[in-house]
């Protein structure tokens, strides 16, 4: 039951002590920019709606701008249904059933393989698990619910230091199949990028909007910040 779980994971006796409760991340409001058809956009100075042909994204990976700055409860499921269906319909319209599958170029394949090999064979001494935990604690402490300039800057400085440590991580498992160590290392690279985008964006946005609450800038500023942050 609950008492056994709390005892096992927190080392607490709930008949004598309260259960510790802290906020945690359960949704990412942001991601790859998309249109309402789930097509990925590559905005530029001349066309903010330019489509990246053949590439789609839905769910938390995507940012179709339907939630604003604070998603309401249960809307994530509705988002998946709506945009998942929209993506399928659009894919059916743009795919030529008579066209054969185009294979990626060898140069593109080589780049991916080289990246995997460089991470797997890196001669570092930094533990992936320890660096990930360090990053998680920094994000929890510096980029939490209530934010202000000093803690955001500290968090970004700490992440910048960790990004240097990322160059020295060690993957113990050297196998080519079912290599969870390598998967965790790749995940850490992605997590560091996401954490960096959150921290830099939060520090730059000198206002409060939706789930972004700045104690030093408590008011919404539509004149300067009614826009997305592109990272």
Regions flagged by a language model, labelled:
Residues 8-53:
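FAD/FMN-dependent oxidoreductases across multiple families
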Residues 27, 39-57, 61-231:
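Glycine- and aromatic-enriched mobile tails/lids
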Residues 2, 19-21, 32-34, 61, ...:
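Long, contiguous hydrophobic alpha-helical segments, chiefly transmembrane helices and signal peptides
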Residues 1-25, 90-96, 132, 137:
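An anion/pyrophosphate-binding glycine-rich loop and adjacent beta-alpha core
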């Amino acid at each position: 039951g609950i008492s056994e779980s709390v005892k096992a994971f927190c080392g607490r006796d709930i008949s004598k002590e309260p259960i510790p409760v802290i906020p945690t991340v359960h949704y990412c409001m942001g991601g790859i920019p998309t249109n309402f058809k789930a097509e990925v956009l590559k905005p530029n100075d001349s066309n903010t709606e330019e489509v990246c042909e053949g590439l789609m994204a839905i769910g938390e990976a995507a940012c179709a701008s339907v939630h604003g700055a604070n998603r309401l409860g249960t809307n994530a499921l509705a988002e998946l249904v709506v945009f998942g269906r929209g993506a399928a319909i659009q894919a059916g319209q743009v795919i030529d059933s008579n066209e054969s599958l185009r294979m990626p170029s060898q140069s593109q394949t080589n780049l991916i393989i080289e990246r995997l090999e460089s991470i797997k064979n890196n001669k570092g001494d930094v533990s992936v698990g320890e660096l990930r935990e360090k990053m998680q604690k920094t994000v929890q402490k510096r980029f939490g619910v209530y934010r202000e300039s000093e803690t955001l800057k500290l968090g970004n400085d700490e992440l910048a230091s960790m990004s240097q440590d990322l160059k020295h991580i060690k993957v113990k498992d050297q196998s080519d199949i079912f290599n969870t160590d390598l998967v965790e290392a790749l995940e850490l690279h992605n997590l560091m990028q996401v954490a960096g985008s959150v921290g830099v964006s939060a520090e730059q946005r000198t206002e409060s909007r939706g789930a972004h609450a700045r104690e030093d800038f408590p008011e919404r500023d539509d004149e300067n910040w009614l826009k997305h942050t592109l990272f």
